Amino acid sequence: MTQSNPNEQNVELNRTSLYWGLLLIFVLAILFSNYFFN
């Protein structure tokens, strides 16, 4: 039970959430571009 483990997990969670956020924005941008162009 060291304090480095939860800190590392929090960093990984922040990175994964950031990647998922960017992916979601990317997909939404594609959907909106397809909607406007069509």
UniProtKB/Swiss-Prot annotation:
<keyword id="KW-0674">Reaction center</keyword>
<dbReference type="GO" id="GO:0015979">
    <property type="term" value="P:photosynthesis"/>
</dbReference>
<keyword id="KW-0812">Transmembrane</keyword>
<comment type="function">
    <text>One of the components of the core complex of photosystem II (PSII). PSII is a light-driven water:plastoquinone oxidoreductase that uses light energy to abstract electrons from H(2)O, generating O(2) and a proton gradient subsequently used for ATP formation. It consists of a core antenna complex that captures photons, and an electron transfer chain that converts photonic excitation into a charge separation. This subunit is found at the monomer-monomer interface and is required for correct PSII assembly and/or dimerization.</text>
</comment>
<comment type="similarity">
    <text>Belongs to the PsbL family.</text>
</comment>
<dbReference type="GO" id="GO:0009539">
    <property type="term" value="C:photosystem II reaction center"/>
</dbReference>
<keyword id="KW-0934">Plastid</keyword>
<keyword id="KW-0793">Thylakoid</keyword>
<keyword id="KW-0604">Photosystem II</keyword>
<dbReference type="GO" id="GO:0009535">
    <property type="term" value="C:chloroplast thylakoid membrane"/>
</dbReference>
<dbReference type="InterPro" id="IPR003372">
    <property type="entry name" value="PSII_PsbL"/>
</dbReference>
<keyword id="KW-1133">Transmembrane helix</keyword>
<comment type="subunit">
    <text>PSII is composed of 1 copy each of membrane proteins PsbA, PsbB, PsbC, PsbD, PsbE, PsbF, PsbH, PsbI, PsbJ, PsbK, PsbL, PsbM, PsbT, PsbX, PsbY, PsbZ, Psb30/Ycf12, at least 3 peripheral proteins of the oxygen-evolving complex and a large number of cofactors. It forms dimeric complexes.</text>
</comment>
<keyword id="KW-0602">Photosynthesis</keyword>
<keyword id="KW-0150">Chloroplast</keyword>
<dbReference type="InterPro" id="IPR037266">
    <property type="entry name" value="PSII_PsbL_sf"/>
</dbReference>
<dbReference type="Pfam" id="PF02419">
    <property type="entry name" value="PsbL"/>
</dbReference>
<feature type="transmembrane region" description="Helical">
    <location>
        <begin position="17"/>
        <end position="37"/>
    </location>
</feature>
<protein>
    <recommendedName>
        <fullName>Photosystem II reaction center protein L</fullName>
    </recommendedName>
</protein>
<keyword id="KW-0472">Membrane</keyword>
